[in-house]
Amino acid sequence: MKSVSYTHLNKSENYNLSVDKKEDFYYLDCKDEAIGAILKKLPHASLEVEPCHVTENKVQVNIPENLDASVAKSGMWEEYDSRCIACGRCNFVCPTCTCFTMQDLFYSENGKVGERKRVWASCMVDGFTDVAGGGSYRRKNGERMRFKVLHKVWDYKERNGYHMCVGCGRCDDICPEYISFSNCINKLGKAMEEVSQS
């Protein structure tokens, strides 16, 4: 199985102030004149400073090149039925999640007036896929996790040519159940092997 590894680095020259702590000292690189004027008034040693940048991600994510819709049939998603609590925190910190829902608000002062609002929502919370008549497309948390993961790394790429996930790791950091989106993506290779053998 061949896989593609994605490493996003944050090296940039586009900053006003860089602050790096090394041992007990702070090293500043200032490009902003206003901030520089304030810093010059403080007692400090003037050094040539090269800001520290991330040069390698601690977690490598490998997305199988042969990834397709059949991975949805893998048993790996059942793990998330019990682990995920459907809080939606992973979605709300994600810079690429843009799901929304509509809410109709009625005012008690005047029953003839109301408001329809577009509200940020989460595909991971209960009720997001509810439809008229009491139906719901994804009732189990594992089904929601499957949808989110495949939307980020498979279906979005099929439509747009690149993965939706930017690799920031915010979802890993915020999850109260310590579910790692990165680890989930890394399990896709074995999941593809599983479904190809069945």
What are these regions (language model features)?
Residues 7-8:
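Conserved small/polar residues in nucleotide/adenosyl-binding loops
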Residues 43-74:
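A short mid-domain helix/strand-loop element embedded in enzyme catalytic domains
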Residues 62-82, 100-198:
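Ferredoxin-type iron-sulfur electron-transfer modules in oxidoreductases and energy-metabolism complexes
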Residues 81-91:
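Extended amphipathic alpha-helical segments enriched in small hydrophobics
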Residues 89-105:
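Internal helical hairpin/lid segments
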